[in-house]
């Protein structure tokens, strides 16, 4: 299983695209996780129902078996790391942003923790043009 950390932006969409490619390459399924620690109504990265429908339609068209999870009130990093503890999990795919010098120092707490703590390979991707 390929686990994708999805955010409702071009970086999340790039992660889904690469996740689909990897799932096809490995002949496995896809688990897409879009989690928020706060209120879903104020978290811009949390996908709204229309966005989830679009992702779901795209995944159905891909032919890859998939599941979408949208836990609310949880730490996104912990949710992804827990998913990666599954014996079926092979690869974690996340979208990553280009950062300014200060941002590079910090990397982004979610991406940094995932890269450092994930027990299995992590593929960090950017959308074309970023």
Curated annotation (Swiss-Prot):
Residues recorded as bearing N6-acetyllysine in the entry: 104
InterPro entries linked: Rossmann-like_a/b/a_fold (IPR014729), Universal_stress_UspA (IPR006015), UspA (IPR006016)
UniProt KW keywords: Acetylation
Higher taxonomy: Bacteria, Bacillati, Actinomycetota, Actinomycetes, Mycobacteriales
UniProt keyword Acetylation, yes or no: yes
Protein name per Swiss-Prot or TrEMBL: Universal stress protein MSMEG_4207
Keyword DNA damage attached: no
Posttranslational modification: Acetylated on Lys-104 by PatA in the presence of acetyl-CoA as an acetyl donor.
Family indicated by similarity: Belongs to the universal stress protein A family.
Organism, scientific name: Mycolicibacterium smegmatis (strain ATCC 700084 / mc(2)155) (Mycobacterium smegmatis)
